[in-house]
Swiss-Prot record:
Alphabetical list of NCBIfam families matching this protein: glycerol_kin, PRK00047.1
Documented EC number(s): 2.7.1.30
Keyword line: ATP-binding, Glycerol metabolism, Kinase, Nucleotide-binding, Transferase
InterPro entries assigned: ATPase_NBD, Carb_kinase_FGGY, Carb_kinase_FGGY_CS, FGGY_C, FGGY_N, Glycerol_kin
Family: Belongs to the FGGY kinase family.
Biological source species: Clostridium botulinum (strain Langeland / NCTC 10281 / Type F)
SS bond partners: none
RNA-binding recorded as keyword: no
Keyword Membrane set for record: no
Protein name: Glycerol kinase
Pathway: Polyol metabolism; glycerol degradation via glycerol kinase pathway; sn-glycerol 3-phosphate from glycerol: step 1/1
Residues that, per the record, bind glycerol: 82-83, 134, 243-244
Residues where ADP binds: 12, 16, 265, 308, 409, 413
Length: 498
């Protein structure tokens, strides 16, 4: 009986299940979008029960599409939107509030208060992260402080916190297992990435009871088995990693200096720095890349909040395109951006600027500016933001990047990939299997149950679908980058501080 690995890929806008074979090829995919909830400007929430329901649904669907039985699944890997925070009652299994999403800015003011107390330095030293509303810690605190009765329940030991991975595993095991992995823990702003444990001082500062927190384990190990009610059989849950770290693993960036960019809702650049946690002087995050083989490996990360989401905005709000795919056609109908720059700082701007008060802007408009120029400027914004992050990474790590591995939905846009290569001045490699996030989780799960022997076996699965080489003159490139940097400065510090 042929065996497979199931990967549950719980993203920001959809829940997916992908089944992989031994060669790392996609056997089947099932996907369901779920509701985005925007209670106030800058606030973003999800319904944890809807996420769990849809995730369980697509798992069954993917098995049906592949025409395989649950007995043929050797292990399940989970990868998830990181930082998104769920707090639930362990007695009832019910969330006390909606999941507060990574993009949500509601705790920016509280982060400013912590910064005024000089705590940003402590947080960076311990967690490798910037003090920002993006991470889970202040979201947990907000729930405890603002949801009626939550603080009392937490003090009594009745509330559990988890990122989406923890929430899924808890439900898959019928509440038996409350666990996360090193990569997800490293995104909470509560985890000491050097000592590899929850940090008592940070928990005290934020007034978060330790009893709420999950046990932290390696990214590749058997956490437990699914309850039989789910598939009719028990299947080992054996891999867990945050989406960006999973993509780094799926892209087989196993050596220091190897990097990938995922062009999803946001863009996320990660560079493996090996067993050394590199402290960033350029506004990047130091994070855990993977916990495997009895050790952890670290990475530098640049987070770009709005990547592919700018294309959704062109489609849904401005109605300039009917589908995301059309953007490539429009962008190539004009010779250049005609001096138009779009800075998509809809929820502030991330690395290496970190300004919560920046807002989106379109600059350089003249009477000759057309729809095509704005669409092109939107695509180009992803490449410029990637350039800024990559330069910061090279400076911090002292490693010059030779090539960039790419994945995520927008990497299928050939115009964008060519422009990315031009602006970076390095080769951009798109792999055969672009589902690298799900693939990374599958690899972690498969290694834990002996489905794959080791990382060498996995590396042989990686293959290039298309390579893009830089073809732009330096002078033109420098001029474009200069224009972009000018545009970014105009977008910063726009929103009034409360």
């Amino acid at each position: 009986m042929e065996k497979y690995i199931m990967s549950l890929d719980q993203g920001t806008t959809s829940s997916r299940c992908i089944i992989f074979n031994k060669k790392g090829e996609v056997v089947s995919v099932a996907q369901k979008e779920f509701t985005q909830i925007y209670p106030k400007a800058g606030w973003v929430e999800h319904d944890p029960l809807e996420i769990w329901g849809k995730q369980a649904g697509v798992a069954g669907e993917a098995l049906n599409i592949a025409r395989i039985s649950p007995e043929q699944i050797a292990g399940i890997g989970i990868t998830n939107q990181r930082e998104t925070t769920v707090v639930w009652n362990k007695r009832t299994g019910m969330p006390v509030y909606n999941a507060i999403v990574w993009q949500c800015r509601r705790t920016a003011g509280y982060c400013d208060e912590l910064r005024e107390k000089g705590l940003d330095k402590t947080i960076k030293e311990k967690t490798g992260l910037m003090l920002d509303a993006y991470f889970s810690a202040t979201k947990i605190k907000w729930i405890l402080d603002n949801v009626e009765g939550a603080r009392e329940l937490a003090e009594k030991g009745d509330l559990l916190f988890g990122n989406i991975d923890t929430w899924l595993i808890w439900n898959m095991t019928k509440g038996k297992i409350h666990v996360t992995d090193y990569t997800n823990a490293s995104r909470t702003m509560l985890f000491n990435i050097h000592e590899l444990k929850w940090d008592e001082e940070l928990l005290e500062i934020l007034d978060i009871p330790k009893s709420m927190l999950p046990e932290v384990k390696p990214s590749s190990c058997v956490y437990g088995e699914t309850d039989e009610i789910l598939f009719g059989v028990s299947i080992p849950i054996s891999g867990d990693a945050g989406d960006q770290q999973a993509a780094l693993f799926g892209q087989t960036c196993f050596n220091a200096g190897m990097a990938k960019n995922t062009y999803g809702t946001g863009c996320f650049l990660l560079m493996n720095t090996g067993e050394k946690a590199v402290d960033s002087k350029n506004g990047l995050l130091t994070t855990i890349a993977v916990g495997i083989d009895g050790k952890v490996e670290y990475a530098l990360e640049g987070s770009i909040f709005i990547g592919g989401a700018v294309i959704q905005w062109l489609r849904d709000e401005l109605r300039m395109v009917k589908t995301a795919q059309e953007t490539e056609k429009y962008a190539t109908e004009v010779e250049d951006n005609n001096g138009v720059y779009l800075v998509p700082a809809f929820v502030g701007i991330g690395a290496p600027y970190w300004d919560s008060y920046a807002r989106g802007t379109i600059l350089g408009l003249t009477r000759g500016a057309k729809k095509e120029h704005i669409i092109r400027a939107a695509l180009e914004s992803m490449a410029y933001q990637t350039h800024d992050v990559l330069k910061a990474m090279e400076e911090d790590s002292g490693i010059e990047l030779k090539a960039l591995k790419v994945d995520g939905g927008a990497c299928q846009n050939n115009f964008l990939m060519q422009f990315q290569s031009d602006i970076l001045g390095v080769e951009v490699d798109r792999p055969e299997v672009v589902e690298t996030t799900a693939l990374g989780a599958a690899y972690l799960a498969g290694l834990a149950v002996g489905y794959w022997k080791d990382r060498n076996e996995i590396s042989q699965n990686w293959a290039i679908s298309r390579s893009f080489a830089p073809a732009m003159e330096d002078e033109k490139k420098e001029k474009l980058i200069k224009g972009w940097h000018k545009a970014v400065t105009k977008a910063m510090d726009w929103e009034e501080k409360e």
